């Protein structure tokens, strides 16, 4: 009897979710100055994220020389950011739901500012590592809350574009480090990493809270005020507000979120997709290549100064392609294109180092390696760099978004920490073998994306829940 009641309840929820489809509201299609400003303020944290990711590439020689660090000590320093981010990820979801999206970003900014200043004024490895962990914890918080916040405030027809600006600003931070790391001291670079955090601290006073979070905590009046600011003062926000409230109440009544809830059959599919994309993003080598681009170029015999400068110049235009295409092509085609490019270029980098080891074409392999590294980073930037976070922010319903988002973010940063720490040692083992492994992961990733990743282009968050309600049937039930 109880089982029949549960089935009937889920069927009722499904029917009500499906009623939300095919509803449209012109006010939801408006792009207002408030949405643009709110997105810009949110992605200021993403710029600091990018600076942190590329910092070890631009500052490696200076830090190791000034503080007399060994390779093992510097590898530990590089990986501590991702270790700290994994710690931050554990609390990111809970903080985002208890404090709200804006206050969570404030906490992140405080931790990042402390971290960057500790690095900038470090006199020994202890303060250097403390700063790296502190800023890492802040990045762990912001890596979850920024894409979620942007997805929750954006009109559905441009949600992918706006959420992908998270990746664009990450690439801007990377570009700044790659370019300016050639002539700025590593301490100055650290201070530049803190600058966008100060901008965000001030800017958050002028942007609204997420309407979906306000609905979850029962602040109906604030929900309407937030939507009016986001959609325009003359917009009719009644239908969108109603859909958000109905969806929130349905998922709240359906079940209260707990860790065990994630493994229910109806959530298993989205959890597999979210975690799978994060594992693909990291074990295809992205963190390693971005963090140690200068090391790779140096091993290939290419000028680090020229290579870093050119990578910095190309970084932002590459990410712009993803911003333009994400709501035109859709998530799946862009992911498949991105991962295909990363797979091919990883294999080609492996071939280049194989030729170098065999002492064949010595005058061509440095340039060939640089071209392949540039294409690898470019194909990463247009898809796999940002889309896992875009999709993560879309596919989880409100009642499990906190727990699921925290787990997915934790997986991302934990795997990134492993790859970042191990990369230098992998290069000592076999440079070409390392990139062949990355290429093989890319090949498996193509199969995963083709079979499992859903298309969410053009759907509201409520419509995505309706479309995914039957997706557990795609996963083999045990």
Curated annotation (Swiss-Prot):
Signal peptide: none annotated. InterPro entries: MFS_dom (IPR020846), MFS_ERD6/Tret1-like (IPR044775), MFS_sugar_transport-like (IPR005828), MFS_trans_sf (IPR036259), MFS_Trehalose_Transporter (IPR050549), Sugar/inositol_transpt (IPR003663), Sugar_transporter_CS (IPR005829). It is a multi-pass membrane protein. It is found in: Membrane. Pfam families: Sugar_tr. Keywords: Membrane, Sugar transport, Transmembrane, Transmembrane helix, Transport. GO terms for molecular function: sugar transmembrane transporter activity. The chain crosses the membrane at residues 31-51, 71-91, 110-130, 133-153, 162-180, 188-208, 270-290, 306-326, 333-353, 367-387, 407-427, 433-453. Coiled coil: none annotated. Sugar transporter. NCBIfam families: SP. This is Sugar transporter ERD6-like 18. It comes from Arabidopsis thaliana. The lineage of its organism: Eukaryota, Viridiplantae, Streptophyta, Embryophyta, Tracheophyta.
């Amino acid at each position: 009897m109880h089982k029949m009641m549960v089935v009937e309840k889920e069927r009722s929820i499904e029917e009500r979710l499906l009623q939300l489809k095919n509803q449209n509201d012109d006010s939801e299609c408006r792009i207002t100055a408030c949405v643009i400003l709110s997105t810009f303020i949110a992605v200021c944290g993403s710029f600091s994220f990018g600076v942190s990711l590329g910092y070890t590439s631009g500052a490696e020689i200076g830090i190791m020389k000034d503080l007399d660090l060994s390779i093992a000590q510097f590898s530990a320093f590089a990986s501590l950011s991702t270790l700290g981010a994994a710690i931050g990820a554990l609390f990111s979801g809970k903080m985002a739901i208890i404090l709200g999206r804006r206050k969570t970003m404030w906490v992140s900014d405080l931790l990042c500012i402390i971290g960057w200043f500790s690095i900038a004024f470090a006199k020994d490895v202890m303060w250097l590592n403390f700063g790296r962990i502190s800023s890492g914890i802040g990045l762990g918080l912001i890596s979850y809350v920024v894409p979620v916040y942007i997805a929750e405030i954006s009109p559905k027809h441009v949600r992918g574009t706006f959420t992908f600006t998270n990746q664009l600003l990450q690439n801007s931070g990377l570009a700044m480090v790659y370019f300016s790391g050639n002539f700025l001291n590593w301490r100055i670079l650290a201070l530049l990493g803190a600058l966008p955090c100060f901008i965000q601290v001030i800017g958050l006073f002028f942007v609204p809270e997420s309407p979906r979070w306000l609905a979850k905590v029962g602040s109906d009046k604030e929900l309407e005020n937030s939507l009016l600011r986001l959609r325009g003062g003359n917009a009719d926000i009644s239908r969108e507000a109603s859909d958000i409230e109905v969806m929130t109440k349905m998922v709240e009544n359906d079940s209260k979120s707990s860790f065990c809830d994630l493994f229910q059959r109806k959530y298993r599919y989205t959890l597999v997709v979210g975690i799978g994309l994060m594992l693909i993003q990291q074990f295809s080598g992205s963190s390693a290549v971005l963090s140690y681009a200068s090391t790779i170029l140096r091993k290939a015999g290419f000028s680090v100064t020229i290579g870093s400068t050119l990578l910095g110049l190309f970084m932002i235009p590459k990410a712009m392609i993803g911003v333009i295409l994400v709501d035109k092509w859709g998530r799946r085609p862009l992911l498949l294109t991105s991962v295909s490019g990363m797979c091919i270029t990883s294999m080609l980098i492996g071939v280049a180092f194989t030729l170098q080891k065999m002492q064949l074409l010595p005058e061509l392999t440095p340039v060939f390696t640089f071209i392949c590294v540039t294409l690898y980073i470019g194909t990463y930037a247009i898809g796999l760099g940002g889309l896992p976070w875009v999709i993560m922010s879309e596919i989880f319903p409100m009642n499990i978004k906190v727990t699921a988002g925290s787990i997915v973010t934790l997986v991302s940063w934990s795997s990134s920490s492993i790859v970042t720490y191990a990369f230098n040692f992998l290069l000592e083992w076999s440079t070409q073998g390392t990139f062949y492994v990355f290429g093989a992961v890319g090949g498996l990733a193509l199969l995963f994306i083709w079979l499992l990743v859903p298309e969410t282009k053009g759907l509201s968050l409520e419509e995505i829940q309706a479309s995914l309600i039957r997706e557990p049937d795609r996963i083999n039930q045990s």
